[in-house]
Every structure is written in structure tokens, then in C-alpha cells.
Amino acid sequence: MKMIDASGIGPFRITSDGDARDVHDIHELLKEYNLRHREASQSVPVGVFLEDETGQKLAGLTGETFGNWLCIQYLFISEQLRGQRIGSKLLEAAEAEAKKRGCKYAFVDTFSFQAPAFYKNHGYREVFTLEEYPYTGKRHYYTKKLF
């Protein structure tokens, strides 16, 4: 590997705009590096939705399966539907699909005001808590063995 002396490089460009091109470029560079150093696996989206007769989403779960893992990104239930086990059914459907795809584990993170008890009640185990996030809250990280 050729080392570059960074002392002769010009100033860093610092942004606060979240430019999609900048994010894409760094993501692609990191992905290229990662693929050279780990086994190949494919990220496959998974979505489970409850919609009304017009197609309006009332509840849903989105995520991806990646190798051995179901990674849950978002789970939302309309307030008028909460308390009817719809979240449980969405989660169970996503986990069943992940098992069909060969996943052994699930991962999710949630804020303290969202659903920590929900995930614990479904067999998820807390593995990490990010304190004072973003200022006074907590962000909880959970995993679960699917098999």
C-alpha cells in the first residue's frame, strides 16, 4: 500500500449541507474497501405494511436482510391502531421472512420514548445504550436470535 504524506495536502473542505454526491462517494469508497476484506453478502430490502383501501399506509416495518441479520430500520403504527398487536404482527412477519432468507439474528435500535419495552417483550436483548442522545434521551440497541 502506498502511503501519502498528508502534510502537503491542502485544507479540508468542511460542509454542513449533507450533499448527496459527497455521501454517495464516501459510501462507495467504503463499500469497495469492505468488499475486499469480508465475505460477500447481499442487502435485500424487507417491508411489511398495513394499508387502507386507498393504499394509505397505516402501519409498517422496513429494514433489510444482510447475511445472517435482519436489520430493522423503521417500525411505525398509527396512533389510532396502537394497542391492537399490529406491531407484534408486523415484527413477527418480518422475522418469519428473515428466517426464510436464512437470517439467524435480528438487530434494531429505538429511542427511550419509542419502544424499548416492546422489543424486550419480543425477546430482544439490549446490547448497548447511547446515553444523552441527542441531548437528554437514550437510544437503545437490541439483538435477538431468530433460531
List each language-model region with its residue ranges.
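Conserved N-terminal entry element of GNAT/NAT acetyltransferase domains
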Residues: 1-18
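Conserved active-site tyrosine of GNAT-family acetyltransferases
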Residues: 26, 119-120, 124
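A conserved beta-strand-loop-helix scaffold within acyl/acetyltransferase catalytic domains
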Residues: 41, 52-53, 61-75
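Short hydrophobic/aromatic beta-strand element in the GNAT-like acyltransferase core
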Residues: 45-49, 60, 74, 139-141
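A conserved beta-turn-beta hairpin within the catalytic core of GNAT-like acetyltransferases
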Residues: 65-73, 82, 134-139
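Conserved acetyl-CoA-binding loop-helix of GNAT-fold acetyltransferases
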Residues: 83-96, 121
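Conserved GNAT acetyl-CoA-binding A-motif
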Residues: 98-111
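Conserved catalytic-core motifs of GNAT/GCN5-like acyltransferases
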Residues: 107-109, 125-142
